[in-house]
């Protein structure tokens, strides 16, 4: 599935007019005491920002997971057929931020009832998915999903699968921290894609966590 027009224009404009330099380092194995979480929620640009703002998150990288093609590129993934989804992989300190907090942040930044894409981005590449790295993460993810479903807060059942994590491939550098590098293009893309309008309709204007209590 090729990128939608709003996103294609944002990428082209950012590459054409340049971006402020932001140092990028490849993701490494977590240090002792740190853990990894991986979420697919449509456009990975939009999923980095909310996790970056959480105290206790060490890093958040855009990338690809869930497919069979080794070392996929953005062009390959966006064409479709690789099986990969756009994801954000987070390294965090569980002593400062529990996994359930990351789950809460994930839910309110996606449309959980749309399994065929997210917002204006359609196709398997943009599917929502929770990739778990441990059995404990699986238990918490399944419990969080069931709790949200049981709350009847959403118009339809939650359609987000919980899947074992596979190989993570870091996306190209121009995708990393796009919301900081190209603020105007990023905001234009979000608005044009209808992301914020849909999130407000689902969760409320100032939602920070789903109402599952």
Predicted regions and their residues:
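Flexible coil/turn and secondary-structure edge motifs
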Residues: 2-5, 12, 16, 20-213
